[in-house]
UniProtKB/Swiss-Prot annotation:
Entry's Gene Ontology BP terms: protoporphyrinogen IX biosynthetic process
Sites of N6-(pyridoxal phosphate)lysine modification: K268
Record text on subunit structure and interactions: Homodimer.
Native source organism of the sequence: Anoxybacillus flavithermus (strain DSM 21510 / WK1)
MF term (GO), any: glutamate-1-semialdehyde 2,1-aminomutase activity
Protein name: Glutamate-1-semialdehyde 2,1-aminomutase 2
HAMAP family the UniProt entry points to: HemL_aminotrans_3 (MF_00375)
Chief place where the protein resides: cytoplasm
PANTHER family (UniProt xref): GLUTAMATE-1-SEMIALDEHYDE 2,1-AMINOMUTASE (PTHR43713), GLUTAMATE-1-SEMIALDEHYDE 2,1-AMINOMUTASE 1, CHLOROPLASTIC-RELATED (PTHR43713:SF3)
Named cofactor requirement(s): pyridoxal 5'-phosphate
Assigned protein family: Belongs to the class-III pyridoxal-phosphate-dependent aminotransferase family. HemL subfamily.
Length: 431
């Protein structure tokens, strides 16, 4: 067994300083029945806690670190920028360069606005959609998490699902009444919502791959069906690609599935590990944003040169071949985990989209939030604990996915599979 004494002491202090001892709820490790593990440093595919334990990391800061920790080119670029000034409150050339790089790989984005978080991106995109259409209501999907904006905390995923919270207190009924929530992968329910409220629906917002109820890919035809119904009723289609953007494919989720949204929200990978978000889309819509239009949105640190540099240096290193390599490694990891689970009769379902993998402790096919919730959470907690002791760092929630980086080696994958075999062997006694 590994020692976590320094982490335990750090957490005991943290709970006196911050709500629940953390600055984002899922980091509290409540779902895995452990105290949080405090990290000290990372390099490549490895991460090291303050007790000196080493892990192969599949959290990667919840997805942004697609090149692994402390990538040499990103770090060197950040050093250069830090020496010339970390923020100016004025435009810089690197904003143009990152914008062009994003738009080259995401043709649906004709104009882009940089912000400082994924939440800021989705909140701003919804305000824009309402302002552009003159309508009030939005459609979202059960278990999909789009940040902590009031309109979006209705039947949300991520930490909301992890902690088993109902709709968040503090969201006024007058706000909640404009959010229509339907099951993910259920086009019939979407059509029913439009038949009933279509004249007042401004937008449908969706993750191309639902990443905050585990990893749940879209069923064939689902995303195209959303495109069709929004076109029919004059509503906007917003892809929340904060997680899937430049993660599932070189051309992101919209390129991978061949469906073009009106607006796209980005984050995570485009910041290379620094706080970044962005939203963009059709020029006729984006031109409504101030100062070119009347819909207001602003930010002190939007376009921050440090964050823009980290994003630019990250995207610059990603090629179509990168994603082919990801696919092979992710396939091997998913197959290996499944084989290990079968060997010890562990109920499981594995979903995969590019370099995102979700493992559920249920034999039921997971296609939406209801089926995701059939996973045995006690088994997941035991699995997490055993894998942590084996030196494998996983997201401490059943409702979050694993991520791969370019730094993960074939050896890392095989070590992870062998660790899972040992973990499942120990877990088989509680079935």
């Amino acid at each position: 067994m590994r020692s976590y004494e320094r982490s335990k002491a750090a957490y005991a202090e943290a709970v006196k300083l911050m709500p629940g001892g953390v600055n984002s709820p899922v980091r509290a490790f409540k779902a895995v029945k452990m105290d949080p593990i405090f990290m000290a440093r990372g390099k490549g595919s490895k991460i090291y806690d303050i007790d000196g334990n080493e892990y192969i990391d599949y959290v990667l800061s919840w997805g942004p670190l697609i090149l692994g920790h402390a990538n040499d080119q990103v770090v060197e670029a950040l050093k250069r920028v830090a020496e010339t000034g970390t923020s100016f409150g004025a435009p810089t050339l690197i904003e143009n360069e990152l914008a062009k790089l994003v738009m080259e790989r995401m043709p649906s984005i004709e104009i882009i606005r940089m912000v400082s978080s994924g939440t800021e991106a989705t909140m701003s995109a919804l305000r824009l959609a309402r302002g552009y259409t003159g309508r009030n209501k939005i459609v979202k999907f059960e278990g999909c998490y789009h940040g902590h904006g009031d309109s979006l905390l209705i039947k949300a995923g991520s930490g909301v699902a992890t902690l088993g919270l109902p709709d968040s207190p503090g969201v006024p009924e007058t706000v909640a009444q404009h959010t229509i929530t339907v099951p993910y992968n259920d086009l019939q329910s979407v059509r029913y919502a439009f038949e009933k409220f279509g004249e007042d629906i401004a937008a449908v917002i969706v993750e191309p791959v639902a990443g905050n109820m585990g990893v749940v890919p879209p069923e064939p035809g689902f995303l195209q069906g959303l495109r069709d119904v929004t076109n029919e009723y004059g509503a906007l289609l917003i892809f929340d690609e904060v997680m899937t953007g430049f993660r599932v494919d070189y051309y992101s989720g919209q390129g991978y599935y061949g469906v073009t949204p009106d607006l796209t929200c980005l984050g995570k990978v485009i910041g290379g590990g620094l706080p970044v978000g962005a939203y963009g889309g059709r020029a006729d819509i984006m031109e409504k944003i101030a100062p070119s239009g009347p819909i207001y949105q602003a930010g002190t640190l939007s376009g921050n040169p440090m964050a823009m540099t980290a994003g630019y240096e990250t995207l610059r290193q990603l090629t179509p071949e990168t994603y082919e390599a990801f696919k092979k490694k992710a396939n091997r990891l998913a197959e290996g985990l499944s084989e290990a689970a079968k060997a010890y009769h562990i109920p499981h379902t594995i979903n995969q989209a590019g370099s995102m993998i979700g493992m559920f402790f249920t034999n039921e096919r997971v296609t939406n939030y209801e089926t995701a919730k059939t996973s045995n959470l006690d088994l997941f907690a035991r699995y997490y604990q055993e894998m942590a002791n084996e030196g494998i760092f996983l997201p401490p929630s059943q409702f979050e996915g694993m991520f791969l980086s370019t730094a993960h080696t074939d050896e890392d994958i095989e070590k992870t599979i062998e660790a899972a075999r040992r973990a499942f062997a120990k877990m088989s006694d509680c079935l």
